[in-house]
Amino acid sequence: MNGRFKRLMGLGLIVVLTAAAPASAVTVGKVLSSDKGIVAAAHPLAAAAGAEVLEAGGNAIDAAIATSLALGVVEPYASSLFGEGYMVARMADGRTWSIDFRSCAPAMASYEQMAQEGFKTTGEMKLKLQGACVPGLPAGIREVMSRGATKPLTDLAAPAIRYAEDGFEVNQTFSQICKDNFKTLSENAPDFLNEGLAWELGETFKNPKLAATLRRLAEKGLDDFYRGSVADDIDAFMKEKGGWIRKEDLQAYRAVERTPLQGRYKGYNITVAGLPVGGPRLIENMNLFENFNFAAMGWDDPLRLHIMQEVFLLTASDLSAYVGDPAFSRTAERGMANKEYAKLRLMSVKLGGATTSEDWAAGKGRAGDAPAFEEGMGLSDYLTLPAAAALPAQEQFESASTTHFSVVDRWGNAVAWTQTISGFFGTGYWLDGFFLNNEMGNFWSRPSPEGNGVSDIQPGKRVRTTISPMIVDRAGRVRWVLGTPGAGRIVPTLCQMLIDLIDFNMSLEESINSPKIMSSFNSGEGVSLMEMESGYSEGTIRALEQGFGHKVEIKKFPDLYFGGPNAIERGLFDGRLTGVGSVRRGGAAAAPEN
């Protein structure tokens, strides 16, 4: 690790709390240790909401629900009742489970409907109500509550309602994102603005409409969102403004319990969200990386960074081809997570130089044959089979505006939870105090030849994305609870964190604050593009450019583009919990005082 990176680490040690104090006795900080449970989230008040519930005797499930609802108040640009997501839980007794509350396409959604209304791409709908998918967050909360919550929803929603009614101080992230999206807000949600102006740092933001909606749901039940008065409001708004969602879509929505995907990396067990999100790609990456001795290379070694770049390019194609809603399309979750399949993909990793346009044209941009490994086939058997046709990838619109939080309680129950409305402020339209997602942009803009590709638009289909909440354990004990926003950067960022933690023995704080890289083939110069946060040595950057032939772009550390992990570490020997908030997004950790 070079000296420049060590100097950058100092940025993560300072936290400025500008939010109002929570109602209960909790401690909040950028980095915080506790043996009474802890919450790490993208906003100090959201973390405090979860810690407040822990202090009142609630468990990790209770605290997660309180944190989720609070984020919808303090991060209205990234969280909403009209949002969606995925959570993974590991109970103290070792049981793991997950809830998929991804949004889905409404009944009216189709390529024919797009064409009829003049849309050539799904991205063109992202700031229109046609870009909204049927939301899953309230249904997800309801499902999670049924699996072990000990507190009533009135208690769990109380911190969020208090923040919405009393108001809170606008932080730098809130202000900047509001300014970045001012044109959209002015056109689609002018009453969200502060007398027609963007919200400024230090101003007090209140949301009485959202407080009223939350109180209504807490008293009447979350079903009111899908079948009652809130559903009626949504239905009327969509009909008035030309959106596609109807009350019947809301009534038909269900959150789904899924078996989490399991992987293993150098002695650590990884439990991660599976279909239809980014977990299969994450496990595939780690299976490939397990073949390399990164610790011997060194953290700042250009060969290590080159290998990671090339692996990320390969697995992005597999994500595009094989990760989607299993109720609609052929998927290959088990195949992608198969270590034998990783051996096959390892044969395509270009060690000697950057991937070029010639490599891409020759087939490197195509997915591998992951479906062949779904039932446990070995590499030797596969290599004797006739060659299979690979699938091409399609590009998707995907935004970085998501949020993640992590929870561990005093009993050892752990929750990793990622939620989103896709783009910052979603469609830019808001109703009853919350913004409406624009998840339709995550579907392909044109149908696949077979008509049921993983990201083809189909009514009721859950949209694929890259979110990857995960829990890592060793010898039966939780070690880390991890996750991040960041769209296509989510899986690469989390893989880099795992390598920092396991191969380089970094602390959680060091791992979160270490500079990150991102790979894509969109450099425009015939070679792959490597985007890097500042902090790597100049010699390493020169070697990547001149020795390996990569196009390198440097972004100043810390950059929100690379996500914002909010994570928890459990001491390997003493079991003490340490929570770390993201340096890239003003995150914080909070814990009960008693």
Regions found by a protein language model. Give the residues of each.
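Short, small/polar residue-rich loop motifs at catalytic or cofactor-binding pockets
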Residues: 257, 399-402, 465-467
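Bacterial N-terminal signal peptides
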Residues: 10-20
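Noncatalytic scaffold domains of N-terminal-nucleophile
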Residues: 25-48, 52, 60-221, 225-227, ...
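Bacterial N-terminal signal peptides that target proteins for export
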Residues: 1-11
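Extended C-terminal subregions enriched in glycine
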Residues: 411, 460-462, 494, 503-560
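Internal maturation/activation junctions in enzymes
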Residues: 292-420, 429, 550
